[in-house]
Amino acid sequence: MNLNFMPLLHAYNHASIDFHFNSSARDFCVHEVPLYEFSNTGEHAVIQVRKSGLSTLEMLHIFSQILGVKIAELGYAGLKDKNALTTQFISLPKKYAPLLEKNTSNFQERNLKVLSLNYHHNKIKLGHLKGNRFFMRFKKMTPLNAQKTKQVLEQIAQFGMPNYFGSQRFGKFNDNHKEGLKILQNKTKFAHQKLNAFLISSYQSYLFNSLLSKRLEISKIISDFSVKENLEFFKQKNLSVNSNALKALKNQAHPFKILEGDVMCHYPYGKFFDALKLEKESERFLKKEAVPTGLLDGKKALYAKNLSLEIEKEFQHNLLSSHAKTLGSRRFFWVFAENVTSQYIKEKAQFELGFYLPKGSYASALLKEIKHEKGENNDEF
């Protein structure tokens, strides 16, 4: 497989929309939504922290230096963007709580502010968040492009958007996935096991994005061409599907087609299950009740069946499925932005956008779907 970045297909067919977005603390904000309410009792202090110009790991090092707490004792649910104003929840042993207020000025000097203090029985673990609320400000936006942007947002509100991994997974030079494959091939290895695991997960992410783009291509072909033309296309690709099945696929109301053998998942969380009645599952997909999923290949992965598996096989890798430390999983192919708000400020030529996404989903995927930038090979942040 070619490991160079290729343009990922968009869900919708509008022309590119020209505007400027700068990933900065002024124009990009991320607010973490916790998975559960904190009990206000327990051995772990839980603080809500606001940061700017810092990665989450840099923030943890600052807390370690100022408070004397070991980094391993700090809990966090996920990594937040460096080039943004972000809030997230951090847990630390209760004994360090009295030091927080005493070091307010020290935190402020490092672009950190503790917004609230609570307590809980458990340490916060990776993945212990519901999702994130985002704010983005687009600049140099004309009234016509603002109107186009609102039309795209209406489509996204109705049908959702592709759940692509963002560029954070692939590094500054878009090569993390290549290093991950080299680790699997025993061509390279780093001293820190967490770095090795992250790079391998970048390779998983690259394969997922490629599979999702391929599925979008197939969905568009099914929608845009006749049954006869589709039969010829699938025949050329050595994919087995008959005319009756193609007619049923064309009749699915959602632009992303659910195929025979797809693995579905209840949305926004729940169990995986096989898509047995495609018409029924397509209706549930349209109602945002269940979503088709894509493969994150690895040990004990759950694979698709039938036609979906025939397509998925191209994006499997035996080195992932046999690697003892790399567990396989599945990820939503599609997600739905919620609580979408927008405002166009004509005199400033600015467009302000707010929305919520479930955990693991990237604001850059929504930006990509709006902007449709020509010649893009990855996201802007």
UniProtKB/Swiss-Prot annotation:
Pfam families: TruD. Residues 160-335 form the TRUD domain. Gene3D superfamilies: TruD, catalytic domain, TruD, insertion domain. The active site is at D81 (nucleophile). The keyword Isomerase applies. InterPro entries: PsdUridine_synth_cat_dom_sf, PsdUridine_synth_TruD, PsdUridine_synth_TruD_CS, PsdUridine_synth_TruD_insert, TruD_catalytic, TruD_insert_sf, TruD_pseudoU_synthase. It is an enzyme of class 5 (isomerase). GO terms for cellular component: cytosol. It comes from the Bacteria. NCBIfam families: PRK00984.1-3, tRNA_TruD_broad. This is tRNA pseudouridine synthase D. It comes from Helicobacter pylori (strain G27).
